[in-house]
Design a protein with these regions (language model features):
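Conserved helix-loop-beta segment at the catalytic/binding core of cyclic-nucleotide signaling proteins
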Residues: 1-31, 54, 261-265, 318, ...
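EAL-family c-di-GMP phosphodiesterase catalytic domain
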Residues: 25-29, 68-70, 136, 140, ...
Length: 374
């Protein structure tokens, strides 16, 4: 009813299934007129809906194919509009995209890449890299972050590309579990050598946290590898806290905390989460996003924001990690600001687990491993 009310009298709307609809919009003068029409439809869709005592605000995305430029047969036009819709959703900004010929090749590449990712996940061919973290006060080793890595066709696939692909195709859960298992195995290898890796951080997606059995899976993996729960840190982004089912996210995080696992909030300051989330959710550490660190020596705003985050976190009893630290000047600023831990190319790039283990041997020889057992 909302869609029909927003459209013109001669426009046609058909439900394709689920939450997808097709529109036939005759006699649209130009793209300006099209944009106005789609904005009117989007506004109608986004009117709040009361569901189970909660107010839901629906969002919308559009893909557009133009007759006869993008095809003359109905099936071709529908397919090309669907391709444009996929591109709109991939942008994560809503709105609309007009079909372009290059989109078809991009979709075909993405489909092939998705098939290869699924096969490599099943064959356990993905790997991890470990990036060291350093205690700012004394330069001691402070742990690692585990990062997913994938080589396809003899070349590395950029992590943002294949992680987003995994999210779009429902493979983020097995990908996340694979990374977690490899991270704990690497930690176990270091412990078996008598090294003190301190701990390891692993990124976790909302889809994983919403699985009822996720905390139990984490507990089973910790037990299998003989790793103390306190050595594992789960990293989540601010957007995870804004999920449509925050209650389930909260319960999962509480269960992980009950196991003794630590929780870090990644990319702090770049999302839309409010400060109330720091009170509601069981967080141990904040990670200052690299975008604030990059110019802290020259940009007074970035410097002020970074100092404020450190002060806020410490007032709440939270530790702070600065990401993307690349220069001695940045490190000096963070030290003066009271930041606890640093991570970035100044201390080491992400490296294979074996090389990370060798790094720990060198740190032990230099007296840069903490004395307390972790």
């Amino acid at each position: 009813r909302r869609l029909r009310a927003a459209l013109r009298a001669n426009d046609i709307v058909v439900r394709l299934g689920g939450d997808e609809f097709a529109f036939i919009l005759p006699r649209v003068r130009d793209e300006v007129a099209l944009r106005r029409l789609l904005e009117r439809v989007a506004a109608a869709i986004s009117e709040p809906v009361a569901v189970g005592g909660h107010e839901i605000v629906p969002a919308s995305s559009f893909g557009v194919a133009v007759f006869p430029r993008d095809g003359t047969a109905p099936g071709t036009l529908l397919k090309n509009a669907d391709i444009a819709l996929y591109e709109t959703k991939a942008d994560n900004r809503g709105g609309y995209r007009l079909f372009e010929k290059g989109m078809r090749a991009a979709i075909e590449r993405r489909q092939k890449l998705a098939g290869a990712l699924r096969a490599d996940l099943a064959a356990r061919r993905l790997d991890i890299a470990l990036q060291p973290q350093t205690r700012i006060a004394d330069g001691a080793h402070a742990g690692f972050e585990a990062l997913a890595r994938w080589n396809h066709g003899g070349a590395p696939v950029p992590p943002p590309e294949f992680v987003r692909l995994a999210e779009e195709t429902g493979m983020i859960v097995p990908l996340g579990e694979r990374v977690l298992e490899m991270a704990l195995a690497a930690l176990r290898s270091m412990l078996d050598e008598g090294l003190r890796p301190v701990g390891i951080s692993v990124n976790v997606a909302a889809a994983q946290l919403k699985l009822d059995g996720f905390p139990a899976t984490v507990g089973a993996l910790l037990k299998r590898h003989g790793v103390a729960p306190a050595m594992l840190e789960i990293e989540i982004t601010e957007n995870v806290l804004l999920d449509r089912d925050p209650g389930r996210i909260h319960r999962s995080l509480d269960a992980l905390k009950g196991l003794g696992v630590r929780v870090a909030l990644d990319d702090f300051g770049t999302g839309f989460a409010s400060l109330t989330h720091l009170k509601r959710f069981p967080v141990d550490r904040l990670k200052i996003d690299r975008s604030f660190i990059r110019a802290i020596e020259t940009d007074s705003d970035d410097a002020a924001i970074s100092r404020a985050i450190v002060g806020l976190a410490h007032s709440l009893g939270l530790e702070v990690v600065a990401e993307g630290v690349e220069t001695e000047g940045q490190l000096a600023f963070l030290r003066a600001s009271g930041c606890d831990t640093a991570q970035g190319y100044l201390f080491g790039r992400p490296e294979p687990a074996g090389e990370a283990q060798a790094r720990l041997r060198r740190a032990r020889a230099a007296g840069l491993l903490p004395l307390e057992a972790a």
